[in-house]
Amino acid sequence: MTATLHVIFGPSGAGKTTYAHAFARREKAVAFILDDWMARMFGPDMPDPIEYDWMIERVQRCEAQIWSVVAGCLAAGTSVILDIGLMRRADRDRVREIAAATELPLQFHFVTASAEARRARVAERNVVKGENFAIEVTPELFDFIEGVYETPGPGELDGAIISESA
């Protein structure tokens, strides 16, 4: 079986991390969750309130390391599933370009839910701090992320696996 690069994207609070963990268990793939890496590596040093430039610099560092480890997994024949944000179409296009340049089998997974359900889920996650909690997403941060997120454009979901959570 050929190792495949599975990539999740969707708006904040849609259930992407839950989906990634379930997929990894079911398909015996390795999940790379950017929020987990950020929390473990930089959580103790995180400024309060979070500063955008501080965050972006560390996201880029984490992504570079994640891609390095992903390459090793794929070369060893192990499929991976990435949950690394990909909030903008340009970010998703960059993943397509990387996969094409390295001839990696690529499968996108689009996970979505209504804005009301996502906002409620994030608020609950902030209180419960369960398995999928990495950092607190305040209502202000949620609104900021909503403003950054770009819904899939024409043709972007062609061939994607679509999951709508309640």
Feature-to-residue mapping (PLM):
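NTP-dependent small-molecule kinase module
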Residues: 2, 98, 143-166
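Walker A (P-loop) ATP-phosphate-binding motif of ABC ATPase nucleotide-binding domains
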Residues: 5
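Hydrophobic anchor at the beta1->P-loop junction of P-loop NTPases
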Residues: 8
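P-loop (Walker A) phosphate-binding loop of NTP-binding proteins
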Residues: 11
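Conserved substrate/cofactor phosphate-moiety recognition/catalytic segment
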Residues: 14, 18-78, 124
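Conserved beta-strand scaffold positions in the cores of enzyme catalytic domains, especially
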Residues: 29-31, 106-108, 157-163
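Glycine-rich phosphate-binding loop used to anchor ATP phosphates in small-molecule kinases
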Residues: 57-106
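A glycine- and Lys/Arg-enriched "phosphate-lid" helix/loop adjacent to the NTP-binding pocket
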Residues: 100-150
